[in-house]
A protein has these predicted regions:
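Catalytic domains that recognize anionic headgroups
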Residues: 1-374
Length: 374
C-alpha cells in the first residue's frame, strides 16, 4: 500500500495576503508549491477561523460562532484531528493558548508562551518528539506561529484603546512594524522547512502554510487589528500548499473559502469523506489535474467585535457576502448596508450601496438567508 503522507498545518497568525511580497523568504518558499491568495475566512479572528478550517462547517453550524463561544465546539462534530487519529495518524498541536482548539483527537495538545519561547526551536523539538512517539505512524501536526500576533495585537492592545486617534493616524508606521514582523514569519518558515528536510520527512509531507485572518494597521477607525469588520485586509487569507506531488510556483487569485480546506485535505490524504459538509475540494487543482481553480460564486464572512463602535462578543453582528468582483456588507447594530466594487475600489473606500439595485437585491437575499438560517 502507498504510505500515508504526513499532514502539517502551519498557521501564520494574522498574516496579510497583500504583504506577502515583503518577505524574500516567503517569495522563495512559495515557489515550492501552489499559493491560493483569495480565500475568504468565514470569521476574521483566530478561534472562529480555525474551527471552520478544521471542521469544514461555518461557525453557525459548528458551535464556535462568537468570541465568547470559543469552547462551544459541538460534541458531535468530527474534525480533522479526530479523523486523522482514526486513520492511524499520530496527532499533535502547539497553540498560542490551549483553548484555541479543543483537546479532541490530539495525542499531544500543548501551548507556548508567545513572549519567551523560540518557536523555531520549540516546533522542531515537537516534531522530533512526535517522530519518536509515533512508532512509524504518519503525523498530523498543527503548528501555530504567533510572532505577528505578539507584535500587532499583544503590543498594540496594551498601548492603545480602540478609539485612540494616535494609532489610526500612523498607518505607515503601523504597516512598517507589521512588515518587519512578517520578515520574521518568512525566516521561521525557512527554518521549519530546513528541519523537515533534515529529519527526512519533507518528501513524505503535505505542508500547508496559511493565515487565519489578516491584520488591519489602522485603516478602519474602531479596528486596531481584526475582528471588528469584514473588509479585505482581514477576511482575505491565503493558503500555500507544498508537496512533491503538487504543481510548483503557481499562484491563484480565484475566490475560494475556508470551508473548502476540509474536503481538500481529506482528498489529498486519500481519506474517504462521507460527511455532509458545505465546502468543495480543490485537490485536483493542487495535483495539477485541473489547470484552472474553479471560482466560487460567493463566499461569506461574519464577526462580532470585542471592543469598538459596535461590540458584540456573544454573537456576530457584522456580515458580508463577497463575489469575485463585489462585496455586500451588513452591519446589524446600526442597521447599515455597504456595497463595494472590489475591482475599481480594492481598498473599499467608497460605499456604493444604492448604485446597483439588481445585484444588491440578489446578494441581499442570499446573505439574509445565511444570517437567518442559524
Amino acid at each position: 500500500s502507498v504510505s500515508k503522507p504526513n499532514v502539517i498545518f502551519v498557521l501564520l497568525d494574522g498574516a496579510r495576503w497583500d504583504r506577502l511580497h515583503t518577505s524574500n523568504d516567503f517569495q522563495e518558499i512559495s515557489k515550492e508549491g501552489t499559493l491560493l491568495n483569495n480565500v475568504t475566512t468565514a470569521m476574521p479572528y483566530t478561534v472562529g477561523s480555525l474551527n471552520v478550517t478544521f471542521s469544514g462547517l461555518y461557525g453557525k453550524d459548528n458551535g464556535v460562532d462568537a468570541y465568547y463561544n470559543v469552547l462551544k465546539l459541538k460534541e458531535e462534530i468530527t474534525n480533522l484531528p479526530i479523523i486523522f487519529k482514526k486513520e492511524g495518524y499520530f496527532t499533535a498541536c502547539d497553540l498560542l493558548h490551549e483553548k484555541i482548539l479543543a483537546n479532541r483527537g490530539f495525542d499531544i495538545h500543548q501551548s507556548h508562551d508567545e513572549f519567551s519561547d523560540d518557536l523555531e526551536i520549540k516546533h522542531k523539538n515537537l516534531i522530533k518528539q512526535c517522530l519518536e512517539k509515533a512508532n512509524g505512524k504518519p503525523l498530523f501536526l498543527f503548528l501555530y506561529f504567533s510572532r505577528l500576533h505578539t507584535i500587532t495585537v499583544s503590543d498594540v492592545l496594551k498601548k492603545y484603546e480602540w478609539n485612540d486617534k494616535r494609532f489610526y493616524n500612523k498607518k505607515d508606521e503601523n504597516l512598517k512594524r507589521y512588515d518587519n514582523g512578517f520578515k520574521e514569519v518568512g525566516k521561521y518558515m525557512r527554518g521549519l522547512l530546513y528541519s523537515l528536510k533534515k529529519l527526512k520527512i519533507y518528501d513524505d509531507s503535505i505542508i500547508i502554510f496559511f493565515s487565519d485572518h489578516g491584520t488591519g494597521v489602522g485603516e478602519r477607525f474602531g479596528e486596531r487589528n481584526y475582528g471588528s469588520f469584514t473588509y479585505e485586509e482581514t477576511i482575505r487569507t491565503f493558503y500555500l500548499f507544498i508537496s512533491k506531488d503538487f504543481k510548483k510556483g503557481r499562484i491563484s487569485e480565484k475566490l475560494r473559502d475556508t470551508i473548502d480546506i476540509f474536503p481538500t485535505v481529506l482528498d489529498l490524504a486519500k481519506i474517504n469523506n462521507n460527511l455532509r459538509r458545505p465546502g468543495d475540494s480543490f485537490a485536483e487543482f493542487l495535483l495539477g489535474n485541473n489547470n484552472e481553480l474553479k471560482e466560487k460564486n460567493y463566499t461569506f464572512s461574519e464577526t462580532g467585535a470585542l471592543h469598538g463602535l459596535y461590540p458584540s462578543p456573544d454573537k456576530s453582528n457584522v456580515f458580508c457576502i463577497k463575489t469575485p468582483t463585489q462585496k455586500l456588507m451588513y452591519l446589524d447594530s446600526p442597521k447599515q448596508w455597504k456595497f463595494f466594487d472590489l475591482i475599481n475600489d480594492p481598498n473599499e473606500m467608497e460605499n456604493k450601496y444604492g448604485s446597483d439595485l439588481g445585484t444588491e437585491k440578489k446578494l441581499q437575499k442570499i446573505l439574509n438567508e445565511f444570517i437567518n438560517n442559524r
